[in-house]
Amino acid sequence: MIVNGGMDDMAVNYIASKYTTVKIGNGGDSTAASQTELDSPVAEKVVTPSVIGSQLIWTAEFTGADIGLQGVSELGIFKTDSDATDDTMLSRVTFTNTGVIANSDTVTFTMRLEVNA
């Protein structure tokens, strides 16, 4: 029998080690459980999340040059396998569009996820 603590540990550590791609985009539709990609991806970064208890925290910085002139209004966490043709989306959030960011300015996005096995 796998006890609760072991299940929690496996879930948190699996997600932390596999879901390391943060993508931003400029879509704004509601997120559906069947959704597999951002509405309109703009940029992505590889980020290993911090683990605090059962909480995972991804922090990704993007410059205005990364974001482009359209701004961004959605963020997703993805698993990318080297042999996969498509990424697997774990979670997606939408927010008010950032608008244009100066090329040399940096925007920091933080995504927190509570994992309960």
Residues covered by each model-derived region:
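Small cysteine-rich, disulfide-bonded extracellular modules of the LU/uPAR three-finger superfamily
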Residues: 1-73, 80-117
